[in-house]
Regions:
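Glycine-/small-residue-rich active-site loops that bind phosphorylated ligands and cofactors
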Residues: 70, 74-75, 102, 125
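Short, charged/polar, Gly/Pro-enriched secondary-structure boundary elements
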Residues: 138-140
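Conserved catalytic-core motifs of GNAT/GCN5-like acyltransferases
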Residues: 96-98, 114-132
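Conserved acetyl-CoA-binding loop-helix of GNAT-fold acetyltransferases
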Residues: 69, 75-88, 108, 112
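Acetyl-CoA-dependent GNAT
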Residues: 2, 6-65, 70-71, 83-84, ...
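Short beta-strand element of the conserved SAM-dependent methyltransferase core
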Residues: 39-42, 131-136
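Conserved GNAT acetyl-CoA-binding A-motif
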Residues: 89-101
Protein backbone atom coordinates (compact mmCIF):
# COMPACT_ATOMS: atom_id res chain seq x y z
CA UNK A 1 0.00 0.00 0.00
CA UNK A 2 1.13 3.52 -0.75
CA UNK A 3 2.70 5.65 1.97
CA UNK A 4 0.52 8.63 2.95
CA UNK A 5 2.17 11.84 4.08
CA UNK A 6 1.94 15.60 4.00
CA UNK A 7 3.04 17.03 0.67
CA UNK A 8 6.40 18.79 0.54
CA UNK A 9 7.58 21.59 -1.75
CA UNK A 10 9.59 19.10 -3.81
CA UNK A 11 6.34 17.19 -4.57
CA UNK A 12 4.63 20.06 -6.40
CA UNK A 13 5.70 19.11 -9.93
CA UNK A 14 4.71 15.45 -9.39
CA UNK A 15 1.33 16.56 -7.99
CA UNK A 16 0.78 18.85 -10.98
CA UNK A 17 1.60 15.97 -13.33
CA UNK A 18 -1.24 13.86 -11.85
CA UNK A 19 -3.81 16.68 -12.01
CA UNK A 20 -5.21 17.09 -15.55
CA UNK A 21 -5.26 20.87 -14.94
CA UNK A 22 -2.09 20.84 -12.83
CA UNK A 23 -0.01 23.25 -14.86
CA UNK A 24 -2.96 25.63 -15.01
CA UNK A 25 -3.24 25.66 -11.24
CA UNK A 26 0.39 25.34 -10.26
CA UNK A 27 0.18 28.37 -7.96
CA UNK A 28 -2.87 26.87 -6.22
CA UNK A 29 -1.04 23.57 -5.70
CA UNK A 30 2.00 25.42 -4.34
CA UNK A 31 -0.24 27.31 -1.90
CA UNK A 32 -1.95 24.09 -0.76
CA UNK A 33 1.42 22.50 -0.07
CA UNK A 34 2.73 25.62 1.67
CA UNK A 35 -0.41 25.75 3.84
CA UNK A 36 -0.06 22.05 4.79
CA UNK A 37 -3.43 21.32 3.16
CA UNK A 38 -2.24 18.61 0.78
CA UNK A 39 -1.71 14.90 1.38
CA UNK A 40 0.14 12.66 -1.06
CA UNK A 41 0.23 8.93 -1.61
CA UNK A 42 3.68 7.67 -2.61
CA UNK A 43 4.64 4.24 -3.88
CA UNK A 44 8.39 3.54 -3.85
CA UNK A 45 9.03 7.28 -3.85
CA UNK A 46 6.68 8.02 -6.75
CA UNK A 47 3.71 10.32 -6.07
CA UNK A 48 0.68 8.30 -7.20
CA UNK A 49 -2.13 10.41 -5.72
CA UNK A 50 -2.96 13.54 -3.78
CA UNK A 51 -5.79 15.17 -1.88
CA UNK A 52 -6.34 18.76 -0.75
CA UNK A 53 -8.20 19.24 2.54
CA UNK A 54 -9.11 22.88 3.13
CA UNK A 55 -9.94 23.54 6.80
CA UNK A 56 -13.10 25.58 7.34
CA UNK A 57 -13.41 26.29 3.62
CA UNK A 58 -17.07 25.30 3.14
CA UNK A 59 -19.46 27.10 5.49
CA UNK A 60 -16.83 26.80 8.25
CA UNK A 61 -16.50 23.06 7.59
CA UNK A 62 -13.51 21.24 6.15
CA UNK A 63 -13.75 20.64 2.41
CA UNK A 64 -11.87 18.15 0.26
CA UNK A 65 -11.15 20.34 -2.73
CA UNK A 66 -9.05 18.15 -5.01
CA UNK A 67 -8.49 14.41 -5.15
CA UNK A 68 -6.55 12.79 -7.97
CA UNK A 69 -4.94 9.40 -8.43
CA UNK A 70 -2.55 8.64 -11.30
CA UNK A 71 -4.38 6.57 -13.94
CA UNK A 72 -2.33 3.40 -13.53
CA UNK A 73 -2.90 3.47 -9.73
CA UNK A 74 -6.68 3.82 -9.84
CA UNK A 75 -8.92 1.10 -8.38
CA UNK A 76 -6.09 0.00 -6.06
CA UNK A 77 -7.23 1.69 -2.85
CA UNK A 78 -5.16 4.88 -3.16
CA UNK A 79 -8.16 7.22 -3.33
CA UNK A 80 -9.87 5.37 -0.48
CA UNK A 81 -6.74 5.64 1.68
CA UNK A 82 -6.44 9.37 0.95
CA UNK A 83 -10.11 9.97 1.80
CA UNK A 84 -9.76 8.08 5.08
CA UNK A 85 -6.61 10.03 5.94
CA UNK A 86 -8.45 13.29 5.26
CA UNK A 87 -11.15 12.31 7.74
CA UNK A 88 -8.50 11.46 10.35
CA UNK A 89 -6.91 14.88 9.78
CA UNK A 90 -10.16 16.86 9.74
CA UNK A 91 -10.47 19.89 12.00
CA UNK A 92 -14.29 19.92 11.94
CA UNK A 93 -16.84 17.28 12.92
CA UNK A 94 -18.30 17.21 9.41
CA UNK A 95 -16.33 17.19 6.15
CA UNK A 96 -17.70 18.00 2.69
CA UNK A 97 -16.59 17.00 -0.79
CA UNK A 98 -18.05 17.36 -4.27
CA UNK A 99 -17.65 15.59 -7.57
CA UNK A 100 -19.12 15.81 -11.04
CA UNK A 101 -22.10 13.69 -12.04
CA UNK A 102 -19.88 12.08 -14.68
CA UNK A 103 -17.33 10.88 -12.09
CA UNK A 104 -19.00 7.59 -11.20
CA UNK A 105 -15.88 6.00 -9.66
CA UNK A 106 -15.63 8.84 -7.12
CA UNK A 107 -19.36 8.80 -6.40
CA UNK A 108 -19.22 5.04 -5.83
CA UNK A 109 -16.19 5.43 -3.53
CA UNK A 110 -17.96 8.09 -1.48
CA UNK A 111 -21.08 5.99 -1.07
CA UNK A 112 -19.08 2.89 -0.13
CA UNK A 113 -17.22 4.91 2.53
CA UNK A 114 -20.40 6.20 4.15
CA UNK A 115 -20.51 9.72 2.68
CA UNK A 116 -24.08 11.05 2.56
CA UNK A 117 -25.52 13.10 -0.31
CA UNK A 118 -25.97 16.76 0.57
CA UNK A 119 -27.23 18.23 -2.68
CA UNK A 120 -26.53 18.94 -6.33
CA UNK A 121 -25.16 22.15 -7.83
CA UNK A 122 -25.85 23.07 -11.43
CA UNK A 123 -24.09 25.63 -13.58
CA UNK A 124 -20.48 24.97 -12.56
CA UNK A 125 -19.53 22.62 -15.40
CA UNK A 126 -21.95 22.89 -18.30
CA UNK A 127 -24.06 19.75 -18.53
CA UNK A 128 -22.24 17.99 -15.66
CA UNK A 129 -23.82 18.83 -12.27
CA UNK A 130 -21.72 18.75 -9.12
CA UNK A 131 -22.83 16.32 -6.38
CA UNK A 132 -22.00 17.41 -2.82
CA UNK A 133 -21.48 14.83 -0.06
CA UNK A 134 -20.69 15.04 3.65
CA UNK A 135 -19.25 12.70 6.26
CA UNK A 136 -19.65 13.00 10.01
CA UNK A 137 -16.15 12.41 11.34
CA UNK A 138 -17.39 11.16 14.70
CA UNK A 139 -19.40 8.46 12.90
CA UNK A 140 -16.21 6.87 11.56
Amino acid sequence: MAELRAAQAEDVSAIAAIDPLGLGRLEEIQALVRDHACLVAAERGEIVGFLALKPGHFYKRDFIDLTFVAPRWRRQGVGRALMRAALRNASTSRVFVSTNDSNMPMRELLRSEGWAPSGVLSGLDEGDPEHVFFHDVSAG
